[in-house]
Amino acid sequence: GKDVGPGVAAICTTALLKHGRSPDDPAVARSLKYLQTFVHDDGGIYSPESPVQNYETSLAIQCFAAANMDGRYKSLLAKADKFIKTIQSGGEPSEFNYGGSGYEPKKKRPDLSNTSFLLDALQASGIGPDDEAVKRALVFVSRCQNLETENNTTSFAAKNPDGGFYYTPAAGGVSEAGQTDEGGLRSYGSMTYAGLKSMIFAGVKADDPRVKAAVSWIKKHYTLSANPGMPKPAQGLYYYLHTFAKAMSAMGLDVLEDDKGIKHPWRHDLLVELAKQQRPDGSWVNVDPRFLEGNTNLVTAYALLALSYAQSGK
């Protein structure tokens, strides 16, 4: 429908493609044609006057990449990849904005969520860790972690050094989970898995202190019934479950042993949790509508994508 917009349409169509539908399947083909109506001369794929150009284009790239088995979208993808690179923050590497992506070019505050979508899109297009845009993004991602290293000299890491991730160090620093009493930015689940996944896509190895610290955090906060760390645990739950599954798959883990020594077969756990939450009509929706999770189409697509990573390991 015309009210859906390219972002939700792209994520729904990607979910169908990940579950085995062909690009020539009537529903998928119709959606791909709809998405092409949002392609701009600058290469971006977004609604007119969109305040979320990076999100929409990054989601569309992942969709067209999943439908590009015969190369039919090669030119479209090359232009879209170039667009999201051009709206990535530049400047000096010492600046906290450097390497991050935000909602649109006119809004200069980048964040980890947008930057992880950028990296997801580039990875889907086959662009690897040696690409300059990926290297720049890794600089920003490292600064979103509560870990003091040579890669992160922000003031926030020392105030809450738990290895998790938060929303952004830019513009004074923001965490959707709030601040600690010491003025640190609280880590939370969706951003920690987004940060971990982003580092893996950017070529950071498992023995790197940044990855080790992130894995340590998730071992302490393993759950699929809440977005851990958030003041209201249902907020962003399905974004979290999708990001959790994609990160765990990227790590190549089948079982996660938590900090108490309990082994969690995460794929099975995720299937059980999503089966429990599925509504009689087959859809999913969040009881907490924040972050657009009152939108049944979006939340069902998140659930289907999470299941695709649990089932295929890709």
Regions found by a protein language model. Name each.
Residues 32-38:
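Active-site-surrounding "flap" and adjacent substrate/cofactor-binding loops of secreted or lumenal enzymes
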Residues 1-28, 41-82, 87-272, 276-314:
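An alpha-helical repeat/solenoid feature that recognizes helix-turn-helix modules
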